[in-house]
Amino acid sequence: KEYRRQRQMCIRDRMGDGLKMVAGNKLEAFLYRMTNTPLKGVALGTGVTSVIQSSSATTVMVIGFVNSGMMKLKQAIGIIMGANIGTSITGWILCLSYIDGKNGIAKILSTATISAVVAIIGIILRMACKRSVHKNIGNIMLGFAILMTGMQTMSGAVSPLKDSPTFTNMLTMFSNPLIGILVGIAFTAVLQSASATVGVLQALSVTGILTFSSAFPIVLGIGVGAACPVLISAIGANKNGKRTALVYLINDLFGLILWSVIFYTVNAVVHFGFMDMIMSPVAIALLNTVFRVATVCAVSYTHLTLPT
């Protein structure tokens, strides 16, 4: 834990101070243009997080900018909200790893085909190109290929568990809102990645026994768990840097409390018929995206931010 804390702090300080020295006023002016309205900030946060596939990493970068004085807290809030939406894109990308084609277009889009093609292109860019930009693109493509292959392997390993009574009982236990939320928070805090937890849920869904009632509370807790590395990175930051991390946590806590109270209160009255619906990887990705977009909309509507 101490190593992780020191690493997060080092990344934050080196990145923020280094960018300020290299780019100076130009980067500061660029950041202002891209975040001078809340909508622009949300769009920037969504775009950046979609590329790097980590809301925590995006927020750590933002904390570095705020800590070095290149960005004001008011500008950072929009990016943080957008990061919560952008991280849900990974779930949709992972859906590709569950395409099991036997012929035609489905076979072309299968995990094995996509992973192989992407890996080959990545290796060529990594080995043959001299420019660092091309090499970095190659690294991204290799990482994507490994991610797809890993998800397919994990799904294959989890699939036989559907016949295990112990595994079935465990998933049923997650339908308890409190237990499910705590599992989502704890699991994401350990993995330090909301996308990884969503990926694990998608892998569990291939067993055919993961229901909406078990998946929903876990998804609710994912955002709060993802705040752990962000809070760690804020240790040693100045006042505004710490407040930036706190905004991230407050937004996710607000979404967790708001939607859990509304959903389970209404369910107690009307008894939703989809609670026992079997979840698929696409359904998990959709649930995660809808929850995050709804949270951002609710936060924007209530203007839940720290005073600047």
Spans of model-derived segments:
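Membrane-embedded alpha-helical segments of transport systems
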Residues: 51-56, 77-93, 111-118, 147, ...
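Single conserved hydrophobic/aromatic residue that forms the stacking wall/gate
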Residues: 1-7, 303, 308
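Alpha-helical transmembrane segments of multi-pass membrane proteins, especially transporters
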Residues: 25, 33, 37, 45, ...
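Membrane-embedded helical hairpins/re-entrant loop segments and their flanking transmembrane helices
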Residues: 19-47, 61, 66-67, 199-204
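Membrane-interfacial segments at transmembrane helix termini in multi-pass membrane proteins
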Residues: 238, 263, 267-273, 283-287, ...
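Helix-loop-helix hairpins and the membrane-proximal interhelical loops
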Residues: 4-38, 140-182, 186
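Hydrophobic alpha-helical transmembrane segments of multi-pass integral membrane proteins
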Residues: 37-61, 177-200
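Membrane-interfacial helix-loop connectors
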Residues: 49, 61-83, 91-113, 188-226, ...
